[in-house]
Amino acid sequence: MLTLEDKDMKGFSWAIVPALTSLGYLIILVVSIFPFWVRLTNEESHEVFFSGLFENCFNAKCWKPRPLSIYIILGRVFLLSAVFLAFVTTFIMMPFASEFFPRTWKQNFVLACISFFTGACAFLALVLHALEIKALRMKLGPLQFSVLWPYYVLGFGIFLFIVAGTICLIQEMVCPCWHLLSTSQSMEEDHGSLYLDNLESLGGEPSSVQKETQVTAETVI
């Protein structure tokens, strides 16, 4: 029974976690190339600008600070790191990846660490861009800003990676416990069978209670 539960838990984790990481990877990838994170409006000239970590505006005006602030530089580094780690996590979780990365008993722990680190990188990129907007408002004066959908979508992507990492971590913590319980149960059953075999070899017969215990153990198995 424990073995079946172990397999069911592994099947659940290896089914839901790739879905979470794949969706999180797509979210981070789309948000990273989308420039409209924040909408800025100059109250004096009524000019409208859009701000993101990367400047790739086409038909709209992007805010292009020169030189680049430390917030933008670090934000780009963390966001690109999140994209790379999200891709690695998603690739490892795919079924065909077992040919390249053999699944060991520590893989759940490694995947949990990568998932948490991916979420942390994306969160730091979000915070650094927010600090850039705050510094911009203090420097340029009257600027109105409104947060656009990439902020909320990226926050949801961070949540997905936290959930995926938590599932992998729980799997890593629970499986050894089930393995120990299964081993203990198997040792008790082997000890009981050995006792009955020794008793029969000496010419004795097991009591009715021992027979009932053996039948019950076989039924459970």
Curated annotation (Swiss-Prot):
Keywords: Membrane, Transmembrane
Cellular localization per UniProt: Membrane
Pfam families: TM225 (PF25452)
GO cellular component: membrane
Membrane-traversing stretches: 14-34, 77-97, 109-129, 147-167
Top-rank taxon: Eukaryota
Membrane topology reported for the UniProt record: Multi-pass membrane protein
Protein name, UniProt field: Transmembrane protein 225B
Protein's organism: Homo sapiens (Human)
Lineage, uppermost ranks: Eukaryota, Metazoa, Chordata, Craniata, Vertebrata
